[in-house]
Regions:
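Surface-exposed, low-hydrophobicity interaction/linker segments
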Residues: 23-24, 28, 32-68
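Terminal, regulation- and interaction-focused segments at domain boundaries
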Residues: 83-90
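Short, flexible, solvent-exposed loop/turn segments with mixed acidic/basic and small polar residues
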Residues: 39, 72-80
């Protein structure tokens, strides 16, 4: 990374970058291990994907100026908490709190600050779970506690945040009132969607494999033909003797006359 705004502290900035980059690697490794263990033990991985980044010097300088701080490496380390950032995308809101709890329980991680924008969304509708943590980076001659910001959100939250950022960028951060209102309404839809998907997931988990099989066994054969008509295409039992281009289009009247069985979703109808 370049350092145009820190040219007088080039070496110090390189050293700081080493710390932040090392901290990100450690956090990413921990998350990968947790996700793999969760998948092995619970047959489910709560993390969809992870991204990480280090703030650009220009963005860091802008943040310091907004807080009336002098542009020095010392102030960056002391006052800019999100120089190194990790974003974790989960499937459900319950996964967010599960991951946050697992991170907090790591013996070498200190949780410095938490902001729950899911329980209390920002005024513009933004929702996410933020953690500022400190993780030790072991160098040859010392150990340095290095800060990392961790953002945890669902796929739906991430979609809204990404599109909201693009829209505001086009307006240079000054979107018209009706646009802001529409975005806020979209955030409410996203919150409803997350809650609905979470409820569905909890209901699905209540079904055991046995109950699912029992439910499937109760589906009348007549329903299969209805589904077949909706799908429109089917595979003949004797398709091995047909050329690919001769594969017939499903027709219930034809089926009744010929009496041939057809495969539908792995079932013979």
């Amino acid at each position: 990374m370049d350092f145009p705004v820190f040219y007088n502290e080039a070496e110090e900035w390189k050293n700081a970058l080493l710390l932040y980059d090392s901290a990100l690697k450690q956090i990413n490794t921990k998350l990968e291990i947790l996700n793999n263990e969760f998948k092995l033990v619970h047959k489910y991985n709560p993390i969809e994907h992870i991204t990480s980044r280090i703030k650009t010097p220009q963005s860091i300088a802008r943040k310091l100026r907004l807080n009336n701080r002098e542009l020095t490496i010392e102030n960056i380390i002391k006052y800019v908490n999100d120089v190194a950032g990790v974003r974790i995308i989960c499937s459900f809101t319950s996964d967010i709190y599960r991951i946050a709890d697992l991170i907090a329980k790591q013996s070498d991680i200190k949780v410095l600050k938490v902001k729950d924008y899911i329980m209390c969304p920002k005024e513009n509708g933004y929702s996410s779970y933020h953690m500022i943590v400190a993780i030790p980076v072991f160098l040859t001659d010392r150990t340095v506690e290095t800060k990392v910001e961790i953002q945890i959100r669902t796929i739906a939250m991430d979609l809204w945040a990404s599109l909201e950022h693009k829209i505001y960028y086009k307006f240079e951060g000054k979107a018209p009132e009706h646009i802001r209102k529409e975005l806020k309404e979209c955030s409410e839809i996203v919150a409803y969607l997350d809650q609905k998907m979470l409820s569905l997931n909890e209901e699905i988990k209540r079904y055991s494999n046995d109950s699912l099989q029992e439910y499937q066994a109760e589906i009348p054969d007549s329903n299969l033909s209805v589904v077949a008509e909706a799908i429109g295409t089917i595979i003949e039992e004797d398709e091995q003797t047909q050329k690919p281009e001769e594969a017939p289009v499903y027709n219930t009247e034809h089926a009744a006359k010929t009496g041939k069985k057809r495969m539908l979703f792995g079932l013979w109808a």
